[in-house]
Amino acid sequence: MIVVDTNVIASMWVPNDLDEWVYKVLKKDDDWVSPLLWRSEFRNVLSIYLRKDILEFSVVLQATEEAEQLMDANEFEVNSTQVMSFVLDSSCSAYDCEFVALADDLDVPLVTFDKKILREFPNIAIHPKEFAL
């Protein structure tokens, strides 16, 4: 089991050069979990691609459905005190700290491309390339 953040999830459905590593992560460990927040962040990511006419509406809807199926029953609530504790100890947003808190709570790695999270939480976060090797 691993915690994945929204950028990792989104990399499977939006145009990018990172999807190769995401699929390697999925092959190594397909038990992905995230805080419930991932859904809202994912919709926001897709909205950017939709508004810039990079993805069509039908593709966005399909991506949403597929991502929700992937993460079905793998979504967790997180403890606000724990999240705010990580906020206090870092310069990361509360959104980012939700993923950190979940990984810490489950005692599993957080797989992320986010450089700030990787830098500020090196004992919890790991880059997909590192995890996949």
What is the predicted role of each segment?
Residues 10, 44, 84-85, 101-104, ...:
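A cross-family signal for key residues in well-ordered alpha-helices
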Residues 72-113:
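Active-site neighborhoods of divalent-metal-dependent phosphate/nucleic-acid chemistry enzymes
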Residues 36, 54-61, 77, 97, ...:
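Non-catalytic, surface-exposed connector residues within folded enzymatic/regulatory domains
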